[in-house]
Structure formats: structure tokens, C-alpha cells
Amino acid sequence: MRSAIIVSALASVASAARPYLNEPDTGIDEVLGQLPVGSLPNVTDMHALHDFEWAARRYLPKVNYTYYRNGAGGEWSYRNNLEVYNRYKLRPKTMVDITNIAESMPTTILGHNFSAPFFICPCARAGYGHPDAELNLVQGAGAGKILYIPSSFSTLPIEQIAAKRAPDQILFSQVYTNDNDTANQILFDRAEKAGSKALVWAIDAPGSPSRQRAARYGVGSANAVFITNTWEVLDKFRTMTKLPFILKGIQTVEDAKLAVQHKVPAIILSNHGGRNLDGSPSSLEIALEIHREAPEIFEQIEVLADGGVRYGTDALRLLALGVKAVGIGRPMMYSNVFGVDGVKRAVEIFRNELTNDAANLGVADIKKIDTSFVDWTPNHWYS
């Protein structure tokens, strides 16, 4: 009898195992699932950012999709990036005049004007999604008047990407550095000559990550050496270029404080999309830590963030803490399978979602959103 109870209990636990989802079931399989694998639906059938992942997963060769999708280790940080937002309930405010919310969306980053507080993150190898690679991303960002940050490991050279900019379009350039300052100088000079207005230094990848999913398909990390990323190196790099450095990969309040002390103009809270160190915190958790222990940082420097953002409500939680703009990575790479039209649609989907979610939250001016719009007591959903 006792053994039967134990077996029954174990079976109950197994049947109650938590789901592991990339996207929710919104009926897309029922409506579009008859399409042959390896083909694409109409881009107008994409209604949310997660729809682009569904399309890319069915369309791309497994190796290509895996490169974009993979995370480090057991992929807990990848999953946590997606799920952390819903651990904090929103607090909608009613009887608010929100009719000017769309007009409040434009923002600045390092003094440059953009149409909305979100941007396309640096992601490597856009050529895995489409032959035109990063050209689609730069043109899609230009059409939407948002920031695009090409990766150091782009399929195409920065010169070719920059040549496709719209008039007055602003680009920043991500840089991975190494201990060869001759190579670093060439990298900085190329970005500057191509017209980049800032260097986004990836400081969270000093070693090679453990990406088992990527290794399985032969698409491991582009980084394979140990690199010296220190404040002393930052001081040296500043003598090598006129461009400002944004530090991408800040994951603790202590490092955010040091960035302020070292007069860094902006930081990006990021765990590299869960691709570098499994167990690293999400950008929302980092922003919460900063807000609780040193909220003045959000006034002292510009704080950006990326990781797991799929919905307008995700971005609103980050903006409520003081984050100035929110980065989107994988969904934009998935949208690239449709070419420039896919990127344009992804940008507009997210813009519309962010604007309408802000209105439904009772935010009259996106720049005035604050912590009162979120219940910051975690509900422990999937924690």
C-alpha cells in the first residue's frame, strides 16, 4: 500500500512537470501548421514577436536555428529571461488621459534621437537567417527610426552595413576586443570611419561559454580565448578612439557603481541572452537590484537593458525601474528570415504593442512611468 502511494505521488509530480516554452500556444499551429516545413507563411500572418520564432524554427536548417536559439549550460538563464517578467504583476491605473501616449514614445540615447525606447541588439551571423544578413536589420531599424547595433561578428563588414543606412540614421557598433591592441585599434577605427556614434563593448564574455546545444550542432561560440576586460583596459581604449564606450553586460549593482565612478556614459544590463553563464541574473533582476540599492544610478548614467523581451509589458517593467531603452535580440534575428519586410513588421508589432500596453496600464507619458505601476513583490511564478 505504501509503495503504491509513493508511486502515485511520483507519477503526480511527473505529470505536473513545469512546461518549457519558447512561445505560448496562440493557435498558430492550427492556422498555419499545414504549411510545409521549410516554407514561410505570409509576413502579415505574424502578429507577435514569438510568431517569428515559430516561423524560423520551421523554415531554417536546424543548425542555423540552433545557433540563434541556444543558451549556456542547462539554459536556466535563457528560460529565466523569458519568465521573470511575469513574477511581478502590473498595477493598471484607470481614469487617466492616455491619448498622447504615442507622442511620448520618442527618446534619446547618448543625445541621439530615436522614435521609441527600444532597439535591435547586437546579434552575430545574421546571414544564418537570410542572404542579405545585416542589411535587412539596418534597413528595418532605419525605417522604424530605432537604434541598431551591429555585432562584431556580423556576417557582413561594418562598412557594408553602414552603407545601407537611411539618411540621418544612427548606428552604434558592438566590439569584442582581445589583448592585441593593433587589432583593437583597427576595429575602433573601422567603426568610427563607418559612422558609428558609440562603441558597445561586450564585457561579459571574457571566456568561452559552455553551450551544449550549440556544440551538438557544431555552432559553438565565436569567442575561444581568455580576454582581459578591466577598468584599466577601458582607460587605455579611451585613448585609442574618440567614440564613447557603452559597457554591455553589467550584471551587479557593484559594477554599475563602478561604471558611474569611471564616467561611463551608458551601460547595458544583460546576461548575453542567457548564452554565456548559466545562472546569471536577468536584466530585470539586475535593474531591481540597482533600484533597491543605488537608485541614483538611473539618473547618473543612461541605463539600457536586454534579455527575454517578447512583449510590450516586458519592456514596461524595465522602463518602470528607470531603464531608458530596451533591447530585442533573438526575435529580430528570427524576423530576418522574411527579409527586410520581416524586420520592419517586427519593429512595428513591438511599437504598437508597447504603445497600447502603456495605454492600458494607465501611463499617460512613457517617460513618466515609474515603479508604482508594478507590484514588486514576486509571485514566485516558475521561480
Regions found by a protein language model. Give the residues of each.
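An N-cap/entry alpha-helix motif that binds or orients negatively charged groups
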Residues: R18-L110, G220-A224, T228-N229, K368-I369, ...
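Short, conserved beta-strand segments within well-ordered enzyme catalytic domains
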Residues: K89, P106-T108, P117-C121, L147-I149, ...
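Glycine-rich active-site/cofactor-binding loop and its immediate structural neighborhood
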Residues: N113-L156
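Alpha/beta enzyme core
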Residues: Q139, K164-P167, D179-A305, G312-N336, ...
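A gly/proline- and charged-residue-enriched helix-loop-helix capping module
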Residues: A143-A183
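Internal helix-turn-beta structural module
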Residues: V340-K367
